[in-house]
């Protein structure tokens, strides 16, 4: 799954191979970059929760975020069969109403093996969700 407002040139094949080798239920592109919202990972690379750095909110409630690694989500994710089944169950429970995938990951990280993936090589990454951000990305790619 690739969010439509993300432009990147990382090696997707490397991420697919890492996902297959790990046996994870889901693998998320992550990076050590500034973001008000950070995913929280343990030393093994498994997602344990989420933190809003602006408000101090941590989910799941009661999670001790100390010692966990903070990384920003990059908008690219690979889902295995268990994660797809869990997404379908969430959709059914909500009567087919739309829902955000990040709250799903946060709510499911205790049951599903959700892993972060950081590419080995340098890559470009842009949020192109506004005309201004798209213009900045275009300028970088044309340089």
What feature does the model see in each segment?
Residues 1, 26-29, 116:
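Structural beta-sheet core signal
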């Amino acid at each position: 799954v690739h969010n439509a407002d993300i432009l990147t040139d990382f090696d997707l094949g490397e991420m697919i191979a890492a996902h297959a080798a790990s046996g994870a239920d889901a693998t998320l592109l992550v990076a050590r970059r500034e973001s008000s919202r950070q995913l929280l990972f343990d030393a093994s690379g498994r997602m344990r929760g989420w933190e809003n750095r602006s408000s101090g909110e941590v989910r799941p409630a009661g999670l001790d975020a100390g010692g966990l690694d903070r990384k920003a989500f990059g908008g690219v994710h690979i889902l295995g069969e268990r994660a797809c089944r869990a997404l379908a169950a969430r959709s059914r429970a909500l009567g087919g109403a739309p829902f955000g995938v990040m709250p799903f990951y946060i709510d499911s990280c205790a049951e599903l093996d959700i892993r972060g993936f950081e590419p080995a090589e340098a890559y470009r990454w842009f949020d192109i969700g506004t005309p201004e951000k798209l213009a900045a990305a275009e300028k970088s790619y044309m340089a």
